[in-house]
Amino acid sequence: MIQFILIQNRHGKNRLSKYYVPFDDDEKVRLKARIHQLISQRNQKFQANFLEWENSKLVYRRYAGLYFCFCVDSTDNDLAILEMIHFFVEILDSFFGNVCELDLIFNFYKVSAILDEIILGGEIGESNKKSVLERIEALEKLE
């Protein structure tokens, strides 16, 4: 199960966070800072994108200046989550046309809606790119 998702830039600024298990506000602030500290110091050439953290695993991937980090149960498949991150970024790229950090800042509600189409209650719900894009485009027409 996915516990939370963080998207942060290289400077540690949070661009999107989504929690599927309850955390106190103080805990959220603490874990955002701690996770950025852990991930940003790792060498991508020599270290994997998986990290044991407390009683969970952090699976992350860096795209340009953004870190996409998923915190999952320790029993979840690391590679499946890594592929889910890539799938999410592919959908963002298709929807926004070469997504950048500014797209996440000014269209955070759309990014959140895309994430809600893919992940339901901390579990992967939809894995068909075309289906997700059709639903998001239908929501766009309603605006």
From Swiss-Prot:
Domain of life: Eukaryota
Gene Ontology biological process terms from the UniProt entry: clathrin-dependent endocytosis; intracellular protein transport; vesicle-mediated transport
Main location class: membrane
Example of a GO cellular component annotation carried by this entry: cytosol
GO MF entries: clathrin adaptor activity
Topology class, membrane: Peripheral membrane protein
SUPFAM superfamilies: SNARE-like (SSF64356)
Family label: Belongs to the adaptor complexes small subunit family.
Subunit structure: Adaptor protein complex 2 (AP-2) is a heterotetramer composed of two large adaptins (alpha-type subunit apl3 and beta-type subunit apl1), a medium chain (mu-type subunit apm4) and a small adaptin (sigma-type subunit aps2).
Record-linked PANTHER family: ADAPTOR COMPLEXES SMALL SUBUNIT FAMILY
Protein name: AP-2 complex subunit sigma
